Amino acid sequence: MKTKLNFNMWIPTRILFGADELKNLHSQQMPGKKALLAISNGKSTRANGYLAATEEQLRLAGVESVVFDRIEANPLKSTVMAGAAAAREHGCDMIVALGGGSVMDAAKAIALMASNDGDLWDYVFGGTGKEQQAEHAPLPVVAVTTTAGTGSEVDPWGVVTNEQTHEKIGVEAAFPVLAVVDPKLMLTVPP
């Protein structure tokens, strides 16, 4: 059996890959001056020192950061809306996602809603979504992944659960502008 595999691929995300690449984050051109630093509502990001290391890299890059630590596994629409409100309240002009797929998915949706009015489901295409085009571009996202598997650090999608309708739908929000894939951040992931 012969298989013909043809595809086109476009990934505008700059990728820093390798051991200790997080230590090079400060040398990258940052897309903003104040970041909402999105992490999970768990303990590992802090306990393993990843949050402190990322905050230090942002500080060295001249970027202020505000931590948003409410993202749950399978992020909820209400969490995205709270994150967007926090980004607006603190005058953030970029989002940094530090975590696994759920954090990165939520961060991309937060980036969309931080720069657009209404409800996230206004911009969802599918299910009960209202299929509106966003008026403004999302805030730029920097993704620092601490797990491997979803590819959320290099795709534009964010899967979010609408707790009112029980829908779990991918929202095309934003390609991260920069992804840090540092295998040392994944050493604590269970096998």
Residue ranges and their predicted role:
Residues M1-M94:
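ATP/NTP phosphate-donor binding region
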Residues F68, V103-A107, A143, V180:
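Generic enzyme active-site microenvironment
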Residues T13, N116-P191:
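A glycine/threonine-rich phosphate-anchoring loop and its flanking beta-alpha core
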Residues L60, E72, L112-V124:
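Glycine- (often His-adjacent) and acidic-residue-rich active-site loop
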